[in-house]
Structure formats: C-alpha cells, structure tokens
C-alpha cells in the first residue's frame, strides 16, 4: 500500500465493528472540535467479538485499508476486539501513520484511578478470552487483581437501542454478578458499545465504582500524540464526521442519534 504524508488538515480515521465506535467519535469531537473525522463502521459483519482470531485479523486489515484510502493522519482502533487480537495488523497496514487502540488507553487509565487495586473488566468473548486487558493492566502494576467477564449480549442490545429495556437489566444483573465478592473499585468498559449501557451497568452494580470509558481515554491520548507531532488541526470548525458503513441497517439513523445525540449526516456505503 502506498503511504502518504500527514498534515494538520488530514482527518482522524476511526473504525469499529459497528456503531459502538461512535462513542469514540463523540469523545474526539469533545476533546478536539476542530478535527475532521472519517469513521468506518463494519455494520455488515458486526459483531467481531464472536469471530475467530484469524477472521478478526482479516477484518482488521480490510478496515484499515478502507481508512487509509482517505489519507488519515492517525488511525484509532475503536474496537476493543481488534485492539486485543490484531493491533499489529492495523499497524502494519497503516505503515508510517500512527495507530492508537482503545484497549491500551483504557488499561492505562484504570491503573491510574484504582485505589484498592481491584479492577473489573467487561468485554466481548474474544477480548476477554485473549486476556489482553488483564495483561496490559498487570504489566503496568503487577499488584492489581483483574477480574474479567465476557458480556456478549451487550453489543446486540446496544445495536438494538435497548438502553433501558427490562431484558437489558436482567442480562446485566446476570453478567455483573461475576464481580460479587471481588471488591472491585474500578470497572473498565472493554467495548465501545458499552458506554451506551452505562446507566444500566452502574445501577446494577449498586455501589460506588469508577467507570473507565476507553473512548474518553483514547481521546486524551490522541490529542497528546497529535500535539507532540504538531498535527493538530488549525481549522476553526470541523464539518460533521464523514461516515462510511458496510451495510445500512434500518435502525442506523436511530442508533446514530442515540450514540451521538445529533441527526445523521450523509452516509457512504462501501464494500468489504
């Protein structure tokens, strides 16, 4: 792949398996409102968390190639599953363009904020099975105890817009019971779909726990990297994000409004 030289006016490229990465788009807009954003949601193949590592690595290459065709100055992997199993594929495909994954950003923040060194992680089956969060956290502080729980139904519930549904509360209660007796004071939302279910998650836990939203963590890290490289945009205002999707689900407009709290801009359909 032919690589390009990034400039301050180049866009920030972000990809995810579906609409969950829009939480990262929102966080980037809040942190850096002047930045142009290209977002690719692989809505035709969501969820990634139930796929094999080989398939996830294949998708990671294809998703990155789509973003690279738009000449970004940085690529944010807004998919924890790809961050856990295929970040090296993204980095190889991106060449000289820097890559930031949500997983490392979330792990770093969890280590900084935990007070009792008991951290919980929720994520897709693939992310949890990879042990990537626990490895990243204990690499930074070996004294931290990490308890992980796969919550595979959270992604389809978020994609359906079931943010306050009784079924969501029932499933959350079942999943989060895994943390009973572990005295966690910090919980990492190890999937970018999960912040949309944050209210149900915090209510279900019934105690004061610091919630780590990897979308917010990655926005701060992105700003620092771009500032250090003198690649922050000099524009006054940015246009709406340029949205690319591999399929246009009937509920996409509703989901966009749910995640972004704004109306859906133009959407471009791309083949994968």
Curated annotation (Swiss-Prot):
Q: Name one Pfam family in it.
A: Asp_Glu_race
Pathway, per UniProt? Answer: Cell wall biogenesis; peptidoglycan biosynthesis
Spell out the molecular function terms from Gene Ontology: glutamate racemase activity
Q: What is its EC number?
A: 5.1.1.3
Q: Does the keyword Aminoacyl-tRNA synthetase apply?
A: no
**Catalyzed chemical reaction(s):** L-glutamate = D-glutamate
Functionally, this protein is described as follows:
Provides the (R)-glutamate required for cell wall biosynthesis.
Tell me the protein family, please: Belongs to the aspartate/glutamate racemases family.
Output this protein's name: Glutamate racemase
